[in-house]
Amino acid sequence: TGSERQEDEARCLELGASDFVPKPYNQRVVKARINSVIKLRESAAALSAIEYDDLTGLYTKSAFYYHAGILMRYKPDQSYVVVIADVKNFKLINNIYGIRVGDDILRYLAKIMSKALTDGLAARYSDDQFVMFTSIPKNDFEKYLENAVRYISENAPITNLLVKYGVYKDVDKSISISEICDRAIMAMKSIQLNYEKNIAYYDDQLGQQHIREVMMENDFENALRNEEFEVWFQPKYN
């Protein structure tokens, strides 16, 4: 009966079937539905290739931007934190230990980050950088991050693995996710040459310093373009 057929169709779809073709079969309809299912599967595979990094299984940078933006719009009252992790001297690690060990390090970091995040996002941001986006935990976040950094260092595939972290807490949701990440990167770069400090936090002072540096660079370029520099030679006497 019609009701039995509808029940069978509902049951098949609940069990995971992509489609249901009732009797009597129409050859053209069956072929068309099969082609539609194949195209959907191919589209899903293509989307997965774009969305996930092959090596680590984490989101790609573009997918991270998309999902983080949705998360902020979905929960606008939530406070969020972004953490950028940068593996120091990664090219040197590849040269010394080999690319396979370098890949193991990236997979190791990705695994740790995936386990640490229960309601957030993690992505491979670039070749040797990762990004995490999550709501700010109710417990002591600074202490939690310090313990996580210590654990990562102590259990790394190689000794003396150095990872620098830039943190932007309570992000400004009025700016784009790329700008949010830029602020975390700015914090990370502020300690790139400091071998006694592995974690840095973005603040307004750091932001103002960056603005001044950019303005100085722009002024310098304009001065060069306008030939405003003069070369003076100081005579040297014995």
Predicted regions and their residues:
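Active-site core of bacterial EAL-family cyclic-dinucleotide phosphodiesterase domains
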Residues: 67, 212-238
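Generic recognition of well-ordered alpha-helical segments
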Residues: 32, 66, 108-111, 147-150, ...
